[in-house]
Amino acid sequence: MRVLNGVHQIKIPAPGNASWTTNAYVIESSNGHGHILVDSGWDSQESLWALQEGIRAANLKLRDIKTVVITHIHPDHYGLSSKIKQICGAQLAIHRIDADIILPRYKDFNDLVKKITVMLQQNGVPDDELPQLIDASLWMNKYVTPATPDVKLEDGDTISNGSFKFEVLWTPGHSPGHICLYEQDRKFILTGDHVLYDTNPHVGFNPQSGDNPLDDYISSLEKLERLKVHFILPGHGPVFNALGLRIEKILQHHEERKRAIMRSLHDGLKTAYEIAQQIPWMVNGGSTAFRDLSAWDKRMAITESIAHLKLLMKEDRVSNVDMDGASLYLAKD
């Protein structure tokens, strides 16, 4: 589907779930430099078919894609990139930080699982609940064939195909090496999962997230606020505008979440797991109690709670103590 002149959005379905889609974007070149593909979808037959059909519908050819840019290395954005490289010989570009965690995330996965398990234990998850929280994400790795990038991007780099010229904006938070692509002349931006139309992107603490991912994320949002943008092309959902208003709403959400955490701490020391149990969570547009969440959503709720606690500690509103191997938090005000 053409969303702007020379820019086509292709919805890539998740394996076995056609309603969960990732937006890939094809950026046309009119002078023979080759098209740019931004994000690829999962490494599945359904994803490949959807991509091929979307390219055909745009009257383009897959073999004319010469550059694949990945906004971040989560499976739904990065998984198919290796196969695309094989098919059309495209150059793969990923931010340096995400490029450097491909190996531990996808090839040395058992070591990462051990680190996640220890992190969840330290933050109060009972031993009998650990297996389901860990297993909730293992299926995703089946749909990623790790691909080594040809180019490791940095903040401020330029990507061009002769028709479009993008500035690479490093926007950590959702992933430590997440990037957005800003087309200054045409005033549009591809935001990956950094800014979405009506969903607050997941920002959780984990062994690969960096020390304070929510602080990084908020700084990245403020970085985008300064841009002149007419159209936002996100990694999920529809194209939209009013970037400043959307950022304001996301920031309000995180302020509300911090207030909810502070309320939960007023009656004493708690682990992140205990805090997550006391906070309402939004799932599919509705408020859901922690006990009713899926295993995957519970894990995200816990890691998001840790991320907010890390930020509250930086703001000197929360203190942290270790007690018998558990990480406990206490409100300062």
Where are these regions (language model features)?
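Short, contiguous alpha-helical
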Residues: Q86, T171, M313
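Residue-level signal for inorganic ion chemistry
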Residues: G6, H236, I261, L312
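Active-site HxH/HxHxD metal-binding segment of metal-dependent hydrolases
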Residues: W42-L48, R56-S160, K187
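Conserved beta-strand hairpin/beta-sheet module of binuclear metal-dependent hydrolase folds
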Residues: M1-A58, A90, L181-Y197
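C-terminal regulatory/interaction regions
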Residues: R263-D333
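Histidine-centered divalent metal-coordination motifs
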Residues: T71-H77, H95, H174, H178, ...
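Metallo-beta-lactamase
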Residues: H35-L37, W42-Q45, W139-T148, F164-K258
